[in-house]
């Protein structure tokens, strides 16, 4: 066995966000400084994974709720955009690079997860092609900078899970969600609307197209706030809203349901909603972003 440390490069730096550490630091600081920390300490957050020019300010609302003094392990659940995956996959590297500083994968937790037989390994190529986890790394590094040598990350690529698989993974992750020193980051954008996304749901009673999109998204967000995985599945079946992180969200909701059965009291609130642009005609397109936090009472 070689002890060579394997790194995942920050493959989207320089395109989806700046590759300059000082510049990135200043941007993140700027966004975070404009936001209140009303839901600290968050046990889980939902935040977007688009280019920072589009969603950086929205994501700040979620990351501001992270308390670095209690957080020791950060589970990052992101959807798979490029490879077909029916389960969940773990990374095959030790270190995730960011322009700020390197993040260490928790090999102990990875070992526990791997032993369940429920996971596969993603190749380095798949890992570096995927942006859904990477877009959370600079924000994670920034939120945790005051304790940067004291935490690890657990990246999990989430496949197109069936409802029963979402339940199984929810049950598995619930014991980790129960621990106050763990934070779950769930990576998801909301509605992808327009011809290029092959999705054009429009409820005329809402007025302009972008208002209809907002109404549709907020319907889904309010179901997530009710912490009800079954209603969330039914909403997706009915409206087919193109929420790319629907499976990571489903896993989180099922983990919460498991803990509620054991008497844990939690609440989830969305803190910000944004759209990349306002659609007014059938030629337009937009992506929606939402940021929220789960707190334990």
From Swiss-Prot:
Biological process according to GO: regulation of microtubule-based process
Domain of life: Eukaryota
Swiss-Prot/TrEMBL keywords: Phosphoprotein
Molecular function (Gene Ontology), one example: peptide binding
Annotated Pfam families: Memo (PF01875)
Phosphotyrosine PTM positions: 210
CDD domains assigned: MEMO_like
Record-linked NCBIfam families: AmmeMemoSam_B
Subunit structure: Interacts with ERBB2 phosphorylated on 'Tyr-1249'.
Function according to Swiss-Prot or TrEMBL: May control cell migration by relaying extracellular chemotactic signals to the microtubule cytoskeleton. Mediator of ERBB2 signaling. The MEMO1-RHOA-DIAPH1 signaling pathway plays an important role in ERBB2-dependent stabilization of microtubules at the cell cortex. It controls the localization of APC and CLASP2 to the cell membrane, via the regulation of GSK3B activity. In turn, membrane-bound APC allows the localization of the MACF1 to the cell membrane, which is required for microtubule capture and stabilization.
Family as reported in the entry's similarity comment: Belongs to the MEMO1 family.
Name of this protein: Protein MEMO1
Lineage of producing organism: Eukaryota, Metazoa, Chordata, Craniata, Vertebrata
């Amino acid at each position: 066995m070689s002890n060579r440390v394997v790194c995942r490069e920050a493959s989207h730096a320089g395109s989806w966000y700046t590759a300059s550490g000082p510049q990135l630091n200043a941007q993140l600081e700027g966004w975070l400084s404009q936001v209140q920390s009303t839901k600290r300490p968050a046990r889980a957050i939902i935040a977007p994974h688009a280019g920072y020019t589009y969603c950086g300010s929205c994501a700040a609302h979620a990351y501001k709720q992270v308390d670095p003094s209690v957080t020791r392990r950060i589970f990052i659940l992101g959807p798979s955009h490029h490879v077909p995956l029916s389960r969940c996959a773990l990374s095959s590297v030790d270190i995730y690079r960011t322009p700020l500083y390197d993040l260490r994968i928790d090999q102990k937790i990875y070992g526990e997860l791997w032993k369940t037989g429920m996971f596969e390994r993603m190749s380095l190529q798949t890992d570096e092609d995927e942006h859904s986890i990477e877009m959370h790394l600079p924000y994670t590094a920034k939120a945790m900078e005051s304790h940067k040598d004291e935490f690890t990350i657990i990246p999990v690529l989430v496949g197109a899970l069936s409802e029963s698989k979402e339940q199984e993974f929810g049950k598995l992750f619930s014991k980790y969600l129960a621990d106050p020193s763990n934070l779950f980051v769930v990576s998801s954008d909301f509605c992808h609307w327009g011809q290029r996304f092959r999705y054009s749901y429009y409820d005329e009673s809402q007025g302009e197209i972008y208002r209809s999109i907002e109404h549709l998204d907020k319907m889904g967000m309010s179901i997530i706030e009710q912490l009800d995985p079954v209603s969330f599945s039914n909403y997706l079946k009915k409206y087919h809203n193109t929420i790319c992180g629907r499976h990571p969200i489903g896993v989180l909701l099922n983990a919460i349901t498991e803990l509620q059965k054991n008497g844990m009291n939690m609440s989830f609130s969305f803190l910000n909603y944004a759209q990349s642009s306002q659609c007014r005609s059938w030629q337009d397109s937009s992506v929606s972003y939402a940021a929220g936090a789960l707190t334990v009472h």
